[in-house]
Amino acid sequence: MKKKYRYLEDSKNYTSTLYSLLVDNVDKPGYSDICDVLLQVSKKLDNTQSVEALINRLVNYIRITASTYKIIFSKKEEELIIKLGVIGQKAGLNGQYMADFSDKSQFYSVFDQ
């Protein structure tokens, strides 16, 4: 199995499940940003070169946004974020130095609509 697909199915499953859990709170501050990013990552998972790096950026974004808006996740939501974090750890530290984790635009490209 290619390395690219190693964590693809788990990542798809975890992001879609987390989105379905969080979408009910979309009217609360911070939740809409997290849900937008979860949708964007779900779209990009099939075409990304490194699933692990994308998931790593996602988890960092979720953590910083949750901290900013003082979001407290349920036990099930937290378990999914931890599982995504384990996948993201496989990417290592490349590209994280001096990165802006709170920037939502890192998940969008110029060509996205």
UniProtKB/Swiss-Prot annotation:
Domain of life: Bacteria
One Pfam family matching this protein: EntA_Immun
Keywords: Bacteriocin immunity, Plasmid
InterPro entries hit by this protein: LciA_Immunity-like, Ta0600-like_sf
Record-level GO BP terms: bacteriocin immunity
Keyword DNA-binding applies: no
Function field: Imparts immunity to mesentericin-Y105 to naturally sensitive host strains.
Protein family: Belongs to the immunity protein EntA family.
Protein name per the record: Probable mesentericin-Y105 immunity protein
Gene behind this protein: mesI
